Amino acid sequence: MKKVKILAMAILAISFGACSSDDDSSNNNNIGSIAGRYDLTEFNTGAATDFNQDGTASTNQMDESSCYDGRRIDFNSDNTFTYDMDYILIDTSTGVAVCADNTVSGTWTATNSVITATYEQENGTEVTLNFVRSNNGRTLTQATTLTTYPDRNSEGVAYNRVGSVTTVFTKQ
């Protein structure tokens, strides 16, 4: 009986030791730990592009253009957010590309490791964005499967390619 008790206590100790307070799967909805500024650190696309035409293609579009450098999200402790969406705007009739920006505001909620941010476009359409938290909440990742991102054809004319995009934001 004494051996069974010791074995049970050992199993219990191991099971408690296997849990860690920094597990990304923990239910960490602490608003204070989420609130803050997150800067875009990666804009990864399904296919590599050479948008800046330097001879080196990259799947991280931040290596191809400085147009994304100001993209950031501010999550506030009152469950509101502001998203500065710096991007590349392409005139599809001319193939000319320019840096552009748009700022949206809305509300956010958190469930486990997912932050859901919702805002309304000027035309009244509601948009929902889902960000997965990792790295102890310091990293947010958003994956989109069917979206557009900038590319160039063989003549160097800019166009919108359809594919997957994964953006990564890092808390400052």
Region locations from a protein language model:
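Short, linear, compositionally biased motifs with a strong N-terminal bias
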Residues: 11-13
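Bacterial N-terminal signal peptides that target proteins for export
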Residues: 1-7
